[in-house]
UniProtKB/Swiss-Prot annotation:
It is an enzyme of class 6 (ligase). Transmembrane segments: none annotated. Disulfide bonds: none annotated. Keywords: ATP-binding, Ligase, Nucleotide-binding, One-carbon metabolism. NCBIfam families: PRK13505.1 (NF010030). Its EC number is 6.3.4.3. It comes from the Bacteria. This is Formate--tetrahydrofolate ligase. Belongs to the formate--tetrahydrofolate ligase family.
Amino acid sequence: MKDIEIAQKSEMLPITEVAQKVGLTADEIEQYGKYKAKISLPLSAREQTKRKLVLVTAINPTPAGEGKSTVTVGLGDAFSLLNKKVMIALREPSLGPVMGMKGGATGGGYSQVVPMEDINLHFTGDMHALTTANNTLAALIDNHIYQGNKLNIDQRRVIWKRVLDINDRALRHVVIGLGGATQGIPREDGFDITVASELMAILCLSKDISDLKKRIGQIVIGYNFDKEPVTVDQLGVTGAITLLLKDACKPNLVQTLAHTPAIVHGGPFANIAHGCNSVLATQTALNLADYTITEAGFGADLGAEKFLDIKTPVLGKTPDTIVIVATARALKMNGGVAKDNLDEENVAAVEQGFANLKKHIQSMKRYNVPVVVAINKFTQDTDAELAKIVELCEQDDTKAIVADVWAKGGEGATELAKAVIESCDNDQEFTRLYNSDDSVEEKINKIVTEIYGGDGVEFSAKAKRQLRQFEKLGWNHLPVCMAKTQYSLSDNAKVLGAPKGFKIHVREFVPKLGAQFLVALTGNILTMPGLPKVPAADGMDVDENGKISGLY
């Protein structure tokens, strides 16, 4: 059966019963129908949990993804089978990849969060609220310029873009304000995808609504004619933008097919944003369950690095164990096998591609966090390929366990769960990659050399000018969010495996003072993706009874 068919045949518990599993009362949730709810914050004081945190990441993926969410869900269900008090914390899917390349993003097979159709489509409206808030701010900026421009905003240097929660390459570069004197001030503009919006990052890094409001006020929307930054606070609309997000900042509660409680909240991409679910979601799970299993987008070079260097300082908690998801097909691709031949057995290519997994293991251990490798089993994998991965990991002094979570759900990950539980009891002191007082160049160089395995960084003339400006403005202390291809450790998507001797090319920076990081745009990475030649939307339908098919 397809994933959507499995989900549609499942019997969900009322969300009130799911909430009770982690001690949430009816007064502490706001129901969105029978099977979804928002968690009301702040929660009342309760007994201290073990507060163990497991971060699930992956190797550099194939275009279809390696099942990181599927493993996260299956692992959570396995913890439940072992009678552990557990919660899963995932990101919300964006309609971009749902309609584009990957289809849905709620796990797969018998390791899914449900109701999957709702979560993948409009869910509780968080994405729409973010899109509206972002575009309201854009409209207020252009209105301010049109109505006299008291702040002397240079319309050539407005950096706040409009957003849309779908891949649409035609909107990357637009000209607005055309049509005459009453239609606004003409200027160049563009659209990003909603999940790349600074408001998404702010939502995911805020500790409470007061912090959300403070961060929104700090957003730099552009520069005046004296080249000084202009903020939302100066524009005077901080309260208006915050109130549009007052419900979106509350974590969403759902369940897995096996009824394990799951929080699905916030959805920044890891290649063009920081790739982690909200601090509020993770903190809520830590307060309610002994074990919180969360994930960070794409490979360990992107989502995990940003989780460790950007999210954990705000969260105030570092992972007790990192699980790296690997697949035979991704190793074969990193070993040089063409995409059309990945289903064929090729143990030699698995061994060749292991260099990619080995680099990610090394990078995560650099933070002094225990690492367990989860080999996500696909139906076409052979015993020889899976055995080779286990063997190579053991030679690298890393525990690796095959997880069959797509076919078996939590039962396919009980051995993995036992290994992770044991690993969580190791009390190791976390080691940070860089310090806040390192220069921006030093921070990026450490990411490139220690996490990517590169030789260094090259900055464009524009990036160098921006670095000088950031130093004058006192922004050097901020962490760096690298915007880079997910398919390679380098900034060239075609260079697979574990390349050496390369440099990362930073073409420009985007300061995100509300999110409190600087985005470094590398290579040809885009903040508004395009749809593929045959988008996933082509196979989707809904019948006369409202039953959805083809979602994935």
